[in-house]
Amino acid sequence: MERLNNMGKNSIKKVTVVGTGVIGNGWISRFLSQGYDVVATDPAKNAEVRMRQSIENAWPALEKQGLAEGASKDRLTFELDLAKAVADADLIQENVPEREALKRRVLAEIDHFSKSEAIIASSTSGLKPSILQEDCQRPERVIVAHPFNPVYLIPLVEVIGGKDTSPETINISEQFYQSIKMKPLVISTEVEGHIADRLMEAIWREALHLINDGVATTEEVDAAIIYGPGLRWALMGPFLTLHLAGGEQGMRYMLEQFGPALKLPWTKLVAPELTNELANRVVEGCEAQTTGYSIKKLEQRRDEFLIELIQLLEKYWPGANLKGKL
């Protein structure tokens, strides 16, 4: 613990990424773009080939956004052996599939093979850190650091400690993620799904009901968000959006006038059964929306849009942060 106490964000020089799927590769791209040495490991067949292709696809967007001094794709090493991959790392970012038993086993192995002062961060989208750290000998250095796709562009990362996580680990992690141009949201209370995913899941469930009940197509649901609340949500969250909707009296008027409507049975909340019929309608709808575009092309268009959107956010909402008032 004493060695961990002496660490800071500047002590993190080498990063290891465990698991090179979409999220893992996103982390690799971000770390490299910020000038870090990165070791990646994944036992899957052809993992290294797919990883390097993913980084190549992301790099033009990162160059447009601006690379840190010393940033290079050449600072990436692939190591098949987990023990060797984590041995010298100052921070290990775990991204294995979202299965509790698997994550606990891998995190315990990382804990065993890594340096005692290294921070171990899980990218889990839903599991509590207290559960993930149960099999670790040094649970005080284990946290959840949940990012959002594409990780190399989206700044939010939810940072959560478990019951045994030390305050030092949280502080160092927060500083580190800030240093790589992210917006760490430190969540003090553990809950499944953290914050952002719980909000997104609520919308996702309602969207599935609208498709299942024949109310709308996937394209119409997406359009309802893109040209409506999505534009406002890019600048303000649900609370500030409704605060403005209340006029001069703000949220107080909003709650007085529309609070009773919360009891109307509009929303379903519980997800519909994902039958083959519903799944097919969703898949076919998405494929129809993207006719003529490859996933790679769509990712490039998304990245270009996000870069400009993030720049606009900083221009019009420069005071927004996670520590104080706007």
UniProtKB/Swiss-Prot annotation:
Gene Ontology terms, cellular component aspect? Answer: cytoplasm
Q: What is its EC number?
A: 1.1.1.108
What pathway annotation does it carry? Answer: Amine and polyamine metabolism; carnitine metabolism
Report the subcellular localization: Cytoplasm
Q: Name one GO molecular function term.
A: NAD+ binding
Q: Where NAD(+) is bound, by residue? A: 19-24
**NAD recorded as keyword:** yes
Keywords from UniProt, A to Z, are: Cytoplasm, NAD, Oxidoreductase, Plasmid
Query: What reaction gets catalysed by this protein?
Result: carnitine + NAD(+) = 3-dehydrocarnitine + NADH + H(+)
GO biological process assignments: carnitine metabolic process; catabolic process; fatty acid metabolic process
Supply the InterPro entries for this chain. Answer: 3-OHacyl-CoA_DH_NAD-bd, 3HC_DH_C, 6-PGluconate_DH-like_C_sf, 6PGD_dom2, L-carnitine_dehydrogenase, NAD(P)-bd_dom_sf
Q: Primary place of residence?
A: cytoplasm
* Enzyme class, first EC level, given as a word: oxidoreductase
- HAMAP family linked to this entry: L_carnitine_dehydrog
UniProt record similarity statement: Belongs to the 3-hydroxyacyl-CoA dehydrogenase family. L-carnitine dehydrogenase subfamily.
What role does it play? Catalyzes the NAD(+)-dependent oxidation of L-carnitine to 3-dehydrocarnitine.
Q: How does it assemble?
A: Homodimer.
Name it.
L-carnitine dehydrogenase
Q: What is the scientific name of the source organism?
A: Bacillus cereus (strain ZK / E33L)
The UniProt gene name for this protein comes to: hbd
